[in-house]
Amino acid sequence: MNYDFIITSDRTMITNHHNNEFLGFMTTAPAIGLPELIWKWISAPKIKVDKIGRPIQAPYGLRKIEAALLDAGFKATIIDPDYIHKHLDSAKAIMIGHHDYFALASPSCEWKMLTNKEPINAKCFRKFLTKIINKIKDKKDLKIIVGGPAAWQWLYVPKLIKKYRINTVINGEGEKVIKIIAQKILNGEALPNYIEVDPSDSPKLNEIALIRYPSINGLIEIMRGCPRGCKFCSVTSRPIRFYTLEMIEKELKLIIHMA
């Protein structure tokens, strides 16, 4: 099957950290006392995939975007970074999410200051995206959309937006807006360079899609937002929404059934 929308990220994101989430924190630092290959194997090993490169688990946030697109009737799937090249001929867009694109968030930035070295997550992402760009040089119509918790970081590196051919940066909860962007891509319409999802435009509880396939290590969310409303925090500025027990049960049953 051909997919119009390939959702992906680098190896530090598409991994289950040997079924130990806390090993994932090693990707926020540079390799210390060990060769980088061993450090990466410990913190971000390759994950099992099917014959077309779909990982058996994927980050929960990417699963939500995948589910939103699938529920809306779009041809979308998450693909392991090592298999993206197999889908470039049919894809209309590559959609990328990340927790810390350029090691500007904690604890990556602290490790960077302490060691004066680039953390593994930022290094892996740079190599990952450079590899993609080199493979799509002749595919001028292929769009690249970036988002996720670290989308704000692109605002601090505007030169890289042009270097890496980024068409749209989506900052905020993306389930609603990603469907609009996907339709624009299929229609051949112009895309906005940057979208800031206002808290008032965040999806309501009944607009949040339930994941279709397992998340990394079975992690799910049971609520969004925060009642505090702190101005300095992107989470607390969003409306609070508690998942119903039925929603939680459905996602847990899916993960158990497909494990």
Question: What do the predicted segments below correspond to?
Answer:
Residues 13-20:
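Short N-terminal binding/cap micro-motifs at the start of the first secondary-structure element
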Residues 21-52, 101-127:
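A solvent-exposed, charged loop/short amphipathic helix patch at secondary-structure junctions
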Residues 1, 13, 38-39, 46-51, ...:
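Conserved Radical SAM active-site core
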Residues 1-5, 89-90, 213-216:
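A short, charged/proline- and glycine-enriched loop
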